[in-house]
Amino acid sequence: MGSISNRKIEKPEHHMVLQVAKEMLELNPNEGIVYYKGEPFSGLGVANYSNGQMAEEITYLRGKRNGLLKRWFENGELSFEAFYENNRLDGKVSSWWINGHLRSESNYKKGVVHGLQKQRYSSGRPFKELNIVNGKEEGLQRAWRENGDLFVNYEAKNGRIFGLNRANLCYELEGENIVTDE
């Protein structure tokens, strides 16, 4: 399993980090601020499964997501990891299948998707590789079927697509014979 490397983040002014169950936190959707007892929350919000296993932990600073967000499957395996700065995703975002295989890796820059984005099948085989620049496709974009066959392969340039996008065979080859659905 991977993990996001340590990053410098601003921490609450006091030495002890307040840990509060997420159900005790209140989100004001108009502001995007999380409150605890009427005040913007600074500390660690946590949630557990009914079996006591950790489900999620997220760091807040003055009511905003600021730091590492981690989620786990009920069996204790890591399922999701992301870093927030001032309520926006920033850096690498990773997710895993319940079998422990990497599911996806995305990159963000101040809340906007930016950089190489990868997705995998639960078997671990590649599914998609997308190149994104400031939230838009730019460069080589590829996707594979689970058997490894390439079915999307195009270049995105200035909002235009050049190449093969979602190619589907209308027939199957068995040996040297063409087999149709008749």
Regions found by a protein language model. Name each.
Residues 1-182:
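Glycine/tyrosine- and acidic-biased, solvent-exposed loop/turn segments at the edges of beta-strands
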